[in-house]
């Protein structure tokens, strides 16, 4: 629970920091109170992950390589795929497609890490813990993957990329949606095999390149 309290504390700092920044920055994104409440709610699900047959936050059966390094590298690989899609499918010249990249650094680092934590709570911790504890925990505990897991994983993978639906060429929207559907399915597998910190590490690897570093480049070159 101490690890989760650190994650919750990070989100609280992001919530406060965004409201202390000067308001003149265009497209400033705030970490909302609703998101903070969801992360707080996740605190009560953490002790029950084992009832769903899922690894605990620091499960001793999971190596640090599988918990942090491997998913982080996979996340970076997906960010590179996003960048390739962005490069080969031309964007409209309105400058409105990527407002989330234009967060001021270092606030962007604080905000996007908090956003990653929030998304992992709402698309991994809460739905998987609640539904699998009711439907599929015996099979997961026995080393089998129940149908309930695939259903929850697919539903979350369909819902999670909705934020990518923006004004852009249809080819780019379809490409990004498919990439992030696959991204979320792989995250679900990391969560099943290595726990919440593994799926979070994958998203952080993706966010580091796609949002934070690319956002810094856009901030300093536009």
Indicate residue ranges for each PLM-predicted region.
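Alpha-helical transmembrane segments
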Residues: 1-15, 70-78, 150-159
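Non-cytosolic membrane-interface motifs at loop->transmembrane helix junctions
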Residues: 24-31, 96-102, 169-181
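Juxtamembrane helix-loop-helix connectors linking adjacent transmembrane helices
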Residues: 26-29, 51-116, 132-141
């Amino acid at each position: 629970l101490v690890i989760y309290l650190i994650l919750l504390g990070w989100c609280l700092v992001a919530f406060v920091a965004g409201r202390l920044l000067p308001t003149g920055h265009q497209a400033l994104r705030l970490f909302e109170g609703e998101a903070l409440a969801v992360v707080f709610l996740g605190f009560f699900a953490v002790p029950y992950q084992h009832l769903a047959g899922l690894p605990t936050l620091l499960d001793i059966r999971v190596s640090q390589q599988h918990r942090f390094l491997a998913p982080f590298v996979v996340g970076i690989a997906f960010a590179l795929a996003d960048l390739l899609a962005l490069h080969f499918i031309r964007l409209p010249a309105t400058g409105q497609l990527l407002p989330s990249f234009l967060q001021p650094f270092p606030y962007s680092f604080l905000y996007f890490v908090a956003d990653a934590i929030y998304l992992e709570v709402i698309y991994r911790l809460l739905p998987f813990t609640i539904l699998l504890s009711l439907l599929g925990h015996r099979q997961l505990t026995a080393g089998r993957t129940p149908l309930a897991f695939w259903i929850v994983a697919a539903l979350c993978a369909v819902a999670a990329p909705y934020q990518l639906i923006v004004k852009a060429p249809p080819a780019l929207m379809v490409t990004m949606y498919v990439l992030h559907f696959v991204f979320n399915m792989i995250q679900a597998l990391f969560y099943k095999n290595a726990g919440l910190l593994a799926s979070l590490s994958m998203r952080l690897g993706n966010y580091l390149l796609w949002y934070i570093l690319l956002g810094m480049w856009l901030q300093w070159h536009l």
